[in-house]
Regions:
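Juxtacatalytic substrate-recognition/specificity segment
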Residues: 95-215, 221-226, 233-243
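Short helix/loop segments within enzyme catalytic domains
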Residues: 218-239, 262-279
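N-terminal low-structure segments adjacent to metalloprotease catalytic domains
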Residues: 1-91
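Short, compositionally biased low-complexity segments
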Residues: 86-105, 274-279
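Alpha-helical scaffold elements that line and support the substrate/ligand-binding pocket
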Residues: 190-197, 212, 250-268
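Beta/coil-rich, acidic/histidine-enriched accessory regions frequently appended to metallopeptidases
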Residues: 7, 280-301
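Active-site-proximal structural scaffolding
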Residues: 122, 205-208, 250-254, 267, ...
Length: 301
């Protein structure tokens, strides 16, 4: 039997306030950060262990075109999940058409919260993200995105992540049980990272992070934190969108540039093509600009 190498990542030395990507819309007094950038950097520096390209012709030709969903989770199922903090035991507390909500054993999530996650996922997050960033892969053959609710680091700090090293065996996004107030924004953001990584794992941060902020905005609208990101770049627009340095202005630049491309070059269909293009950075954007969607507006007008 083929054993796929898994690199779940390590958060033991991760400092969210320094290395984390702050989520849009979270309160200034209680910042909540994504650990995805840190985990992706670890994965890249390790040489992309276990890399799978689920939309490549070779991979698609190796699998049946029919989705059997034979390994789907059912409510009440128990299992073990690899996380960036080690393996945890989980129980499926809720399922929906496109998700299974797995809760770390010993953690208590109210049924009203679980119901809200499932309904918001199906009504808003899943359709919005897939419209702009493409359909999800199904490497684990369960036809579900695993929404894994675990204890990470208490209130604030790391709110969630997508671990690219785990993507070789399953489709999972992780949320800290102590940051559930921001769960929907976290899920919209991290699901974009999952979708983007499945098509173009080598993409530059300024495009991937811009798209992740775009996912949160398209799902839940504008707030003061989003305008703060945008204004940080607007007040110093000499900063290049392509020169990524992890500053607030960098996130604002990436977000606004992706929104500009969607507005000019064809909306969700255009962004889907950008995400699916394995060319990176400016080369992928040039490819899109030279062959935009029907009804696109010329850049510069």
């Amino acid at each position: 039997e083929l054993v796929t190498e898994i690199m779940s990542g390590d958060l033991s030395e991760f400092d969210p306030s320094i290395e984390g990507k702050r989520y849009l819309f979270t309160d200034e007094s209680e910042p909540v950060f994504s650990a995805t950038g840190h985990l992706k950097m670890e994965w890249r520096e390790a040489g992309y262990p276990g890399l799978v390209l689920p939309f490549s012709p070779g991979y698609l030709n190796s699998r049946s075109t029919a989705r059997s969903c034979e390994d789907a989770w059912s409510q009440g199922d128990e299992g073990n999940i690899s996380t960036a903090s080690g393996t945890v035991s989980v129980t499926v507390q809720k399922i929906s058409a496109n998700s299974a909500i797995l809760v770390e054993d010993g953690q208590i999530i109210p049924s009203t919260t679980l119901n809200d996650i499932a309904s918001t996922w199906e009504s808003t997050i899943y359709p919005t993200d897939t419209t702009y960033f493409g359909s999800p892969p199904d490497i684990d053959n369960n036809c579900q995105i695993e929404i894994v609710l675990i204890a990470i680091d208490g209130e604030g700090g790391t709110g969630g992540y997508f671990s690219p090293g785990i993507s070789s065996v399953r489709e999972s996004v992780f949320v800290d049980v102590d940051d559930m107030s921001w769960r929907n924004t976290i899920l919209a953001h991290e699901f974009e990272h999952l979708l983007h990584n499945s098509r173009d794992p080598y993409e530059y941060l300024w495009i991937d992070e811009g798209a992740a902020d775009m996912a949160a905005y398209l799902s839940f609208g504008v707030t003061s934190t989003l305008t703060g990101h945008a204004n940080a770049w607007s007040q110093d627009s000499s900063l290049s969108v392509r020169w990524w340095n992890g500053r607030i202005a960098d996130y604002g630049a990436g977000f606004m540039f992706l929104m500009y491309l969607a507005d000019k070059l064809g909306g969700g269909a255009a962004i889907q093509r950008l995400v699916a293009d394995t060319a990176t950075g400016g080369a992928a954007i040039e490819n899109l600009a030279q062959n935009p969607e029907t009804g696109a507006t010329a850049i510069g007008t």
